[in-house]
């Protein structure tokens, strides 16, 4: 899981 784009 990639949690980079969290807006």
Curated annotation (Swiss-Prot):
Q: What is this protein called?
A: FMRFamide-like neuropeptide AF1
Subcellular localization, as worded in the UniProt entry: Secreted
Provide the positions where the record notes the PTM Phenylalanine amide. 7
Q: Which UniProt keywords apply?
A: Amidation, Neuropeptide, Secreted
**Main localization (coarse):** secreted
UniProt family annotation: Belongs to the FARP (FMRFamide related peptide) family.
The alphabetized list of GO BP terms reads: neuropeptide signaling pathway
**Protein's organism:** Ascaris suum (Pig roundworm)
- Protein role: Potent modulator of inhibitory motorneurons. Reduces the input resistance and blocks slow oscillatory potentials in these cells.
| GO cellular component entries | extracellular region
Tissue-level expression: Found in the nerve cords and a variety of ganglia particularly in the anterior regions.
